[in-house]
UniProtKB/Swiss-Prot annotation:
Name the record gives this protein: GTP cyclohydrolase-2
Additional record remark: Catalyzes the formation of GMP as minor product, with concomitant release of pyrophosphate. Release of pyrophosphate requires magnesium ions.
CC cofactor: Zn(2+)
Record gene name: ribA
Membership in a protein family: Belongs to the GTP cyclohydrolase II family.
Quaternary structure, from the entry: Homodimer.
Catalytic activity, reaction form: GTP + 4 H2O = 2,5-diamino-6-hydroxy-4-(5-phosphoribosylamino)-pyrimidine + formate + 2 phosphate + 3 H(+)
PANTHER family noted in UniProt: 3,4-DIHYDROXY-2-BUTANONE 4-PHOSPHATE SYNTHASE, GTP CYCLOHYDROLASE II-RELATED
pH dependence (UniProt free text): Optimum pH is 8.5.
Residues the entry annotates as binding GTP: R49, V50, H51, S52, E53, Q70, E92, G93, R94, T114, T149, K154
Entry keyword annotation includes Zinc: yes
GO term, biological process aspect, one: riboflavin biosynthetic process
Gene Ontology MF terms: GTP binding; GTP cyclohydrolase II activity; magnesium ion binding; protein homodimerization activity; zinc ion binding
Length: 196
């Protein structure tokens, strides 16, 4: 186990009341959060979203990505389902950090795509560690999920880490003229399933 469960509190939202559960990485002290809606106990697979932190999309309403749209759509679907989990994975900018993300944006403004920009900065296309999310699911007592994602790599890593993904639920929202090239690059170079 790479992290521990450290705190929880009620979080009222426009979608209803969630239980906010805080986790801390044992090696680094970095924190992550789960939003739990309804009763997730039992043997029925839980609708879940692993949402990687995106300050620009989630809080600043950037149209450069689909992150904020995905966050809102996931919370809506979880609330409509009556139960579910959103893991807020605190690895900003596919885990290159906010300042490097801004640098990557500047490179994208010069014509690089999102993958090329990461490479220019010395990073892989995706630096995230989804095994942390498997540990969060386990600490919440959940082993079977219906995962809201377009990223088959996320499904693969969580499965390898012991989470039974019984269904991949597409989450295709937020395409606009400002992020079309970004989304096309994610599909072409990172294997994201954006047409299904």
């Amino acid at each position: 186990m790479q992290l521990k469960r450290v705190a929880e509190a009620k979080l009222p939202t426009p979608w209803g009341d969630f239980l906010m559960v805080g986790f801390e990485e044992l090696a680094t002290g970095h924190d992550h959060v789960a939003l739990v809606y309804g009763d997730i106990s039992g043997h029925t697979p839980v609708l879940a979203r692993v949402h990687s932190e995106c300050l620009t999309g989630d809080a600043l309403f950037s149209l450069r990505c689909d992150c904020g749209f995905q966050l809102e759509a996931a919370l809506t679907q979880i609330a409509e389902e009556g139960r579910g989990i959103l893991l807020y994975h605190r690895q900003e900018g596919r885990n290159i950090g906010l300042l490097n993300k801004i640098r990557a944006y500047a490179l994208q403004d010069q014509g690089y795509d999102t993958v090329e920009a990461n490479h220019q900065l010395g990073f892989a296309a995706d630096e995230r560690d989804f095994t942390l999310c498997a540990d969060m699911f386990k600490l919440l007592g959940v082993n079977e999920v219906r995962l809201l994602t377009n990223n088959p790599k996320k499904v693969e890593i969580l499965t390898e880490a012991g989470i039974n993904i019984v269904e991949r639920v597409p989450l295709i929202v937020g395409r606009n003229p400002n992020n079309e090239h970004y989304l096309d690059t994610k599909a072409e170079k990172m294997g994201h399933l954006l047409n299904k």
